[in-house]
């Protein structure tokens, strides 16, 4: 299946205005990178540092910013738009919608749906899924194979739960959310009280509340709150294998890469990013627009927007061990330097 360039631009015109330069009847067979694109492919240039690849690309058409218009026109057809990366993201959505066959709503006969559950029109439920009493599934939602939806839960309209997703009792998922395979929403938070050498379980009585347009990666876990709910606001994006502890609150449109972890009762602001493998310790607060580099450990609250890194740089092992040994002596070296500065100051005063 192909798409005409004119059809692509026209379909996206209600969202983003773009200028099509070249033959509008060119048929696009595939979306591709500049490097791999062939003569029937559509690609994009999102950053000026890749400008050299533009001239070498065999793509039938390239989405570019106004600054790259002249270079793009000199090689062939192009779509000129203010934000090429955003526009290309919209093209991928259009492409999937046009090319991926959407099955008609269907409830598999092996699925268990409690009579006290409420399913709106257009809901699909896959094989061996379980939907418990009191649960509400919104219109057009898709619940894939082996999903388990607990009692009194809520899955919003047009949300998609992939295979083997668990949504525990009382948890809420908003509209148009995407939850990838194996994610667990609403398992007990990690709460225990020490008593006479033993750990006494603190029952987790809160839930998880997830806003609209949230995407949750495969095998990500979001724990239910102890007393208050764990909350993900609208537009949050979590990669695979992310751990969100109990009572955490994550602001709108914050994104976290794979293997990031947020300990209990931390508050993450809106429009933040947390790099892969980074850790935010419990009970800390991050302001809006805070960006944490990969593998960093956040040990204090960050109240000022900006980009933060807490990571010992990689090096060959011998050099790393020497630097690590020096770092352990940093306080001693600091005190020696202060003493040397004081002695030098005394000598200068006497002279």
Swiss-Prot record:
GO terms for biological process: lipid A biosynthetic process. The keyword Ion transport does not apply. CDD domains: LbH_LpxD. GO terms for cellular component: membrane. The active site is at residue 246. One of its GO terms (molecular function) is N-acyltransferase activity. Keywords: Acyltransferase, Lipid A biosynthesis, Lipid biosynthesis, Lipid metabolism, Repeat, Transferase. It comes from the Bacteria. InterPro entries: Hexapep, Hexapep_transf_CS, LpxD, Trimer_LpxA-like_sf, UDP_GlcNAc_AcTrfase_non-rep. Homotrimer. This is UDP-3-O-acylglucosamine N-acyltransferase. It comes from Polaromonas sp. (strain JS666 / ATCC BAA-500).
